[in-house]
Design a protein with these regions (language model features):
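A structural signal for multi-pass alpha-helical bundles of membrane permease subunits
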Residues: 2-309
Length: 309
């Protein structure tokens, strides 16, 4: 007990710094965990509040999960959610690392700051705002693309009914919005690499590409592994704004835009089935946890120093 008290006294300033984040986690992550019981109930809101509604709602076991995955759209939403996220993870990784390496090779610090700012800007834009820009290009009546097509004598294209372009467009927009944030982290790591490694490689006659391949990329391995493990944990979670706002929830596009989060939202707004929505959220969390553990075990087998825990 004395040792614990001494530790508190010696580190009180650090504990104080952690306190806001810890309170945020407790209030918005740990306390709401108890609400997962709704996933196993036929939840109906009563006038006596949330707790009373949970207590008095009937237990239905796994019925909410059965309803979620017995629908005809279960395969489509699972396929879309997983495949899009795999694209975001691996293509986004290549783009982010590539941009970070290019930035590290620039000698003008002013240019680096300009590029960093321009790349980070999309990260802070709302999907609602981005959807207006995409609509300005794709709209069948006043869109820039259709205006160009008609000006050269071609027929208008209804992009909001054309399934072919949307997987590529959504992948592009998702990576475009997020790669700036990731590339800044990789760039910061590259800037922290000991310059003597590069000097030794140069003395040995290594070309620029060989220095990147044998010095830069190995030094990024740990960060790449950690970020990939965390991303894999969210592979069953889709960016709701991207898949709902950009295609305007168009029914003709459901085969390529319908993901788990959009499906749950549409089901919730149409049927007000809170139990099913909770079941979907719990399913995403449990699968995400399992994937993080498995990914970490795999990373530990390959390189113990790169494992998350």
């Amino acid at each position: 007990m004395k040792k614990f008290s001494k530790t508190l006294r010696d580190n009180w300033i650090f504990l104080l710094m952690v306190l806001p984040g810890a309170l945020w986690l407790i209030l918005f992550f740990y306390i709401p965990v108890f609400g997962n019981v709704v996933a196993f109930k036929d939840y109906h809101m009563t006038s006596n509040g949330f707790i009373d509604s949970i207590v008095n709602s009937k237990w239905v076991g796994l019925d909410n999960f059965r309803f979620l995955f017995s629908s005809k759209d279960a395969f489509i939403i699972t396929r879309n959610t997983v495949l899009y996220n795999l694209g975001f993870i691996f293509i986004g990784l290549i783009v982010s690392v590539g941009i970070a390496i290019i930035l590290s090779e620039l000698r003008s610090k002013r240019m680096v700051k300009i590029f960093q700012t321009s790349m980070l800007f999309p990260y802070f834009l709302s999907w609602v705002i981005i959807s207006f820009f995409t609509d300005a290009f794709l709209n069948i009546d006043k869109g820039v693309f259709n205006h160009f097509l008609t000006s050269i004598g071609m027929k208008e294209v209804n992009f909001y009914a054309d399934l072919g372009i949307w997987p590529y467009l959504l992948l592009f927009l998702g990576i475009w919005k997020g790669f700036g944030y990731s590339s800044v982290m990789y760039y910061a790591t590259i800037m922290g690499i000991d310059p003597t490694y590069y000097e030794a490689a140069t003395v040995d006659g290594a070309s620029k590409w060989q220095r990147i391949r044998n010095v830069t990329i190995p030094q990024l391995t740990s960060l790449v592994t950690v970020l990939t493990i965390l991303a894999v944990g969210n592979i069953f979670r889709a960016d709701f704004g991207l898949f709902y706002q950009i295609p305007h929830n168009a029914g003709q596009l459901y085969n390529v835009t319908n993901v788990l989060d959009v499906y749950v939202f549409n089901g919730l707004t149409q049927t007000a089935d809170i139990g099913m929505a909770s079941a979907a959220g719990l399913y995403q969390s449990v699968v995400g946890l399992i994937l993080v553990i498995l990914s970490n075990l795999l990373a530990r087998r390959v390189d113990p120093n790169s494992a998350l825990f």
